Amino acid sequence: MGKGQPIEPNIEQSLVDLCKRTVAMNLLHCYPTTTEHELSCEEWGNGTERSQSMAACQGCVELRKEVHDLRTAVNLILPMLPLYPQLPNTFTTAANIAAQPALHQVLQQSLLRRKPTAHTPTVPQPECPGQLRTVLSSPGSALPNVMLMNHLMINGLKPVSPTLPNGHIQPAVGEASMQTDEQQVKWSSPSSVDSNGQKTDSSAASAGDNQNIDVIGDGSESPTSSNHSVQELAMLTSHQNLFNAFKDSQFIFNQVPKQEPVAPLRVAPATNGTTNGATKAAGPERKPRKPVNDDIVKIVRNQDLSEENIATFQIPVPKAHLSDPTFRPVSEQQIIQQIIQGKKYDEMEVGETMIQLCKKLAEKRVFGPRLMSQTTVAGLNHSNYSNLPIKGICYIQHVCRKVLYDKFENEEDFWDKFREAMRKLAARCRRVRHAKKTKHNREEAQAEMLSKRYGEDIPFNLNGSGLIIPKSEPSETPAVNGDINMITMGQIGTLLTQFNADRKTPLTEVLPAELLTTFLSYLNRPKQEVQSPPPAQNPQNPN
């Protein structure tokens, strides 16, 4: 080499040092600006020629451009792709980490290849710089693959190559993992491989251009080839098999509850066009219940309604006195006069008049309110209460016919009005029943409250001024005999004392004491004469 020519710098060693520093700065997230001093001839020379200028060194200009492109590619690719492959069996141990080569050794072994200096149309520029292809796919790297170690993120991985579909190929168990660990992964440009994985004409240049061909991508097992894709998918499948083994053995999924199958939803039946879009509730259709007949007229008309038979009926009915022994019936003529002589008799219709006559006859003469509160008037099986005695209803029908039959048009009209009157009578029974219950409950509650405060006979223990008198203790004297001749002075004194206590004005203020004493003496003399016999008379001697 002549004296005037610049000495060729040791580019490979300098590029190795630059890549080492770039990788270190990238890992530390530090990107210093490239200065002119860092890329000068002094940096790439051997240190002996310091008089050469930057403009005179054309090789330095090209190297500066290549280094700039290299740094840009490293900054884009290095944070996204791991430098080291996954550790075997996804278990990181100290021995496995120690067995991995150091970072600077990997860079020195992988960057000592010369990149082609010219690009021809037949030799396209690869997607990744040649100095990084072996580094990124080197099997000797020691950094663990975080994405592949996490078996829970296997399904979220993207396909290895954009030219291959995303799928899983099931390999033989145990073969794929061994092949993947022993294979040396290489990088090749996707443009040099067709869709079938075969090399194209562009990858095979002439013999004179062999020095410009990227020898790293040469071979049938490049990362974008079919064989390499199958191996990558086989490695992912091995992780998935391990994940399924853990799942089957319930190693980490033993706490996941089993979901019970959901019952299928019932589909509502289609509606016809007559519903106008209204949907019916699902379930069996309920047929409308037939109302129970409350007509008692049929039962009455089947009876013997002759005047001679009705005259034999006992009115009021016997059950009326059994239910209420204090019931006092009103005469028939008196009830008829109350209806006819009423102010609204001329204004009322004949049906309303019959209703009023039936109510008064039932409550005041035939049944009584106590029996009506326990029964009803309706057809068979219409109510839980039993019917009123049929003889009493026949008697009411007879009175209504005798008084109001002339105002009806025909026989059927009479029975229609009588049917409505019986329904009103049943309603009257319900009202009497409710009134009796309410009154009885109110009276019982009031009597219980008063008896707790003042005694059992408190309603009758009131004086004339309305003040409550304390309950008197029972006397120890025997009860007064009904016969006045057998009464004693002590009993008379007790009666006078009680009588004086019950009076508003004391008895001594009205009658003088001498009169009372004389009266008591008069009452006591006949008793003494009866008790003491007369003295015996001696018979006179005739002599």
Curated annotation (Swiss-Prot):
Keyword DNA-binding found? yes
**Tree of life domain:** Eukaryota
Compartments where found: Nucleus
Its chief place of residence is nucleus
S-S bridge residues: none
Looking at the record, which segments are called Disordered?
165-228, 268-291
Please describe the post-translational modifications of this protein. Answer: Cleaved by caspase ced-3 in vitro.
Q: Where is the composition biased (Low complexity)?
A: 268-282
- Keywords, alphabetical: Developmental protein, DNA-binding, Nucleus, Transcription, Transcription regulation
List, as start-end ranges, the regions of compositional bias called Polar residues: 177-213
The molecular function GO annotations come to:
DNA binding
Q: Which GO terms describe its cellular component?
A: nucleus
Q: What does this protein do?
A: Heterochronic protein which controls the choice of stage specific cell fates. Involved in the temporal progression of vulval fate patterning, possibly by inhibiting lin-12. Acts as a transcription factor involved in the stage-specific repression of insulin/insulin-like growth factor gene ins-33.
Record protein name field:
Protein lin-14
Q: Which gene encodes it?
A: lin-14
